[in-house]
Design a protein with these regions (language model features):
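Bacterial N-terminal signal peptides that target proteins for export
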Residues: 1-8
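C-terminal motif of bacterial Sec signal peptides marking the signal peptidase cleavage site
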Residues: 15-18
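Amphipathic, charged alpha-helical segments and their helix-to-coil junctions
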Residues: 136-181
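Immediate flanking context of iron-sulfur cluster ligation sites
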Residues: 125-140
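Mid-length scaffold segments of soluble, non-membrane domains
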Residues: 77-78, 87-88, 94-121
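Short, low-complexity, disordered segments immediately C-terminal to signal peptides
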Residues: 20-42
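Post-signal-peptide N-terminal segment of Sec-exported extracytoplasmic proteins
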Residues: 38-87, 91
Length: 181
């Protein structure tokens, strides 16, 4: 019996000692390393092309700002640039399907909808700039993978690919289909 008492006492003492927190509480801050990847923000290349029409120049400037916002996956910036461009173009003499396509982009409520609408905006802008370039050139670029491999085009001031249809996903994938001079 005495032996069982010693056994229970030893077991209890062992449990108490093993559950004791031996860590020393110091106020040493814990260092946490966070791996972040900086998102590349694309800035539009300067426009070196000159147009034979002020209205086309105004329209292209707005187009380029919208494209840059889509490259950067910036929904609110794309919406704001589309609305501003629409307001400006409605006060000009420009009569084009571009304004109608731009109006559809301006009312989209998400970035994917804006990107889909941008395809029609690009088609209309291409119609506007062809034959209206006085000096310089634009690059007519293509992504075969856009919209479930249907493909889509866009215009750029620079030969380097910065695709508006995927944002930072596959940003530099695509090709220059032709120059527009």
């Amino acid at each position: 019996m005495k032996r069982n008492s010693y056994l229970v006492l030893a077991l209890g003492l062992f449990l108490v000692m093993s559950c004791k927190n031996n860590s020393k509480d110091t106020d040493t801050p814990e260092t946490v390393t966070v791996n972040t990847t900086a998102k590349e923000i694309h800035k539009a290349a300067p426009t070196t092309v000159e147009f034979s029409s002020d209205e086309v120049a105004i329209a292209y400037s707005g187009y380029n700002a919208i494209k840059t916002a889509l490259v950067n996956t910036n929904f609110s910036e794309a919406k704001s640039k589309a609305e501003t461009s629409l307001d400006t173009l409605r006060r000009t003499e420009l009569k084009s399907g571009y304004i109608d396509a731009l109006a559809l982009l301006a009312v989209e409520d998400n970035i994917d909808g804006q990107r889909e609408a941008f395809e029609a905006v690009t088609q209309e802008m291409t119609n506007l700039v062809e034959g209206n370039i006085a000096t310089g050139k634009l690059y007519y670029q293509y992504c075969p993978m856009a919209f479930n491999n249907k493909g889509a085009y866009w215009l750029s001031n620079e030969e380097a690919i910065r695709k508006p249809y995927f944002g930072d996903k596959m940003l530099k994938c695509g090709l220059v289909e032709r120059d527009i001079e």
